[in-house]
């Protein structure tokens, strides 16, 4: 074999390894390609990767959370209660089971359902309190895209907690209900209802 053949072999190996990376799936099951975004303003802040645990790599870096997978951010949100603090393996199993339920009930990629749920649960307006001469006055303001995603994840996690606390509904079932309802923009879903309420209050404060 001549020396000229060696670079071609390396190139072939590189071409073979590239599709392997592209075919990596979340939890070894869900395809992350072909995810569609309906809201251009939040698209760059909803990251989808096949990695669901980055071990706090960006914990001390401001705004770097947008580079973390939206699935991991949802898992982290589910840990933010007294009972679940630090229990990432439990939160991950809840999300994994919920994704299975979402796929069974909708026959869709649960990652796509999650992305749609976040977009539909993200408030566009909210209120801040301004003081004029010692009097607090509510003022409507636009919500930054990154905060919109943060608020959507918060509402989804709160909906799961409320839907599974002291009931026979499991956390995974509650999460599946929240994701499907929010993806369908159902106002009966807690996350969408909270978004509508925030926007209603902001509209009254214009």
Swiss-Prot record:
Pfam families: Ribosomal_S7
Keyword Acyltransferase: no
The entry's keywords: Acetylation, Ribonucleoprotein, Ribosomal protein, RNA-binding, rRNA-binding
GO cellular component: small ribosomal subunit
Ranges of Acidic residues composition bias in the record: 1-19
Residues the record lists as N-acetylserine modifications: 2
GO MF annotations, alphabetized: rRNA binding; structural constituent of ribosome
Residue span of region Disordered: 1-25
GO biological process, one term: translation
Family: Belongs to the universal ribosomal protein uS7 family.
Assembly: Part of the 30S ribosomal subunit.
Entry function: One of the primary rRNA binding proteins, it binds directly to 16S rRNA where it nucleates assembly of the head domain of the 30S subunit. Is located at the subunit interface close to the decoding center.
Descriptive protein name: Small ribosomal subunit protein uS7
